[in-house]
């Protein structure tokens, strides 16, 4: 189930994922005076992706009993860390 959910996320949010990669490259190449602005742009996009993933996770969790939901949440978060690490840093905060 989680694999399919992440497949859908990657398909639906392919543009966001590509923009995050580009923003990461721009941040890495930014001169010192532009680095803060580049990082803020990158962080905003990462935060958007993380929120979208958390919404996907939470919507499915609401269909599960409490014990199963906790196991699913942990498994989902691990899968995000492995498959979409850019969006995993704060996934547990949402």
Identify the meaning behind each predicted range:
Residues 62-94:
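Amphipathic alpha-helical binding modules
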Residues 1-29:
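Short terminal alpha-helical segments
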Residues 14-17, 28, 32, 54, ...:
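Residue-level signal for secondary-structure boundary elements
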Residues 1-8, 30, 34-41, 68:
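Non-transmembrane, amphipathic alpha-helical segments
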Residues 19, 23-60:
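Contiguous, amphipathic alpha-helical segments that mediate oligomerization or scaffolding
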Residues 7, 14, 40-54, 74-81:
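Generic structural signal for well-ordered, non-transmembrane alpha-helical segments
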